[in-house]
Curated annotation (Swiss-Prot):
SUPFAM superfamilies: P-loop containing nucleoside triphosphate hydrolases (SSF52540). One of its GO terms (molecular function) is magnesium ion binding. The keyword GTP-binding applies. This is Adenylosuccinate synthetase. Substrate binds at residues 298-304. The lineage of its organism: Bacteria, Bacillati, Bacillota, Bacilli, Bacillales. HAMAP family: Adenylosucc_synth. Mg(2+) binds at residues 13, 40. Its main location: cytoplasm. It comes from Staphylococcus aureus (strain Mu50 / ATCC 700699). PANTHER family: ADENYLOSUCCINATE SYNTHETASE.
Amino acid sequence: MSSIVVVGTQWGDEGKGKITDFLAEQSDVIARFSGGNNAGHTIQFGGETYKLHLVPSGIFYKDKLAVIGNGVVVDPVALLKELDGLNERGIPTSNLRISNRAQVILPYHLAQDEYEERLRGDNKIGTTKKGIGPAYVDKVQRIGIRMADLLEKETFERLLKSNIEYKQAYFKGMFNETCPSFDDIFEEYYAAGQRLKEFVTDTSKILDDAFVADEKVLFEGAQGVMLDIDHGTYPFVTSSNPIAGNVTVGTGVGPTFVSKVIGVCKAYTSRVGDGPFPTELFDEDGHHIREVGREYGTTTGRPRRVGWFDSVVLRHSRRVSGITDLSINSIDVLTGLDTVKICTAYELDGKEITEYPANLDQLKRCKPIFEELPGWTEDVTSVRTLEELPENARKYLERISELCNVQISIFSVGPDREQTNLLKELW
């Protein structure tokens, strides 16, 4: 029995899809456990680039199962568009499995997301407007429609009519807007469900069978720890728990099945949307990182905010997600900078702190305390071992590992699959 969880340690976009794809080659099952199509994974190999949102990164290995767990919220229409796009490019998707307990995103969730963000005005949280939050709200309110319900025509019809009646009153009272009608939704989404029917099953049983058979299971996280609804920069967070602990809830396996947790980070920091970002850069170094690193959101296309590496953030992520190994991506992006910086602590009201504050107002007052290290100019994109890295780049990574108290097991020097390097066996 062996399993690895891949989680983002920052605010998402760390390169989890790339690392999951890299590790998937030695896995038997790859499973997503949280989020929805608000996530964006970019995978590059064989001269081709693929952008995924809902489909697990393991889909590219046709002999392995790619599982969407019960903790994921699924927009059936968006999922079919993604699958059709892969099929058109010659990627088979018959190895996909979808939990029959996964919640369904419907048009009224997208409308609600839009209206609620508009109502917030200056207090907007930067939602992707994919209906993720409203779908999770319906789940907790126990009015959500699950994949198992979508497949049964009478069940779906009954639940949809009831929900639209409720949403109509809510939309009118809160936003003075109308809810998408039953006729706007039913036929299209029932048909989408029927197209997905062959993939829908009890994925918890699939995972349990894999463990019993001593197969290797890889759990693929979405977003990042700092977007976690409990442990992130609340309220500027996602609506689920991207931390490793949610694997058990989001896939239906026990905690004893988790063997290792790989925390994925960039050699710097990035963030999309609003919210605190203590090490954010607004100067030429920031411009360099954004352009060289192609820092634009996979899902939204928005320019990402960028900043120096923050060890306060990563120590927090290591603790709340139980990270055993670190994967550092995008080392090549920092090439050419005279000086690179690592945030080692914050100054809050004249005092040095080393842990991430829970209070948002305190966080806004935090000033990063930096340690400066010399940069490097050598091309690193073909490097395959730590020893081959320029001395300054190697010392930079070693200092990150030391500050965060976690070993580096993977490092990446470019976007392609072949530019990802394994320092130790993980399975």
